């Protein structure tokens, strides 16, 4: 599919806005619930800063994940989906990790093929 106007998301939003909105709400609810659980566990494990606002961070994460799929902002010719995901996760994690979390992240990055 080339361009946003031919994408299934665009077509759904244009022709079936109520269904699109309901699907987006379900996606948001599912994803933020999962992210909140992960953030809470990360704080408990002292990998994420205890001062983070878990609700806010989960919403920012969702918004970023939706945003990196915008082909107008991130053309596929310039940004591969894998590169976008990797860069976004690195950006997100560096904003919330503790010193111990950073050590773990750095060791993961070094061992990644």
Task: Put a short name on every predicted segment.
Residues 1-4, 26, 30, 64-71, ...:
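Phosphate/oxyanion-binding loops and surfaces in catalytic or ligand/nucleic-acid-binding neighborhoods
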Residues 38, 91-95:
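C-terminal alpha-helix
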């Amino acid at each position: 599919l080339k361009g946003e106007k031919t994408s299934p998301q665009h077509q759904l939003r244009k022709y079936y806005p109520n269904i699109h909105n309901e699907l987006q709400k379900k996606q948001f609810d599912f994803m933020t619930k999962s992210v909140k659980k992960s953030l809470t566990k990360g704080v408990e494990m002292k990998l994420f800063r205890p001062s983070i606002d878990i609700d806010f961070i989960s919403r920012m994460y969702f918004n970023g994940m939706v945003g990196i799929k915008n082909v107008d902002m991130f053309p596929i010719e310039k940004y591969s989906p894998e590169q976008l995901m990797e860069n976004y996760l690195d950006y997100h994690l560096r904003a919330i990790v503790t010193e111990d979390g950073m050590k773990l992240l750095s060791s993961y990055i070094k061992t990644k093929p």
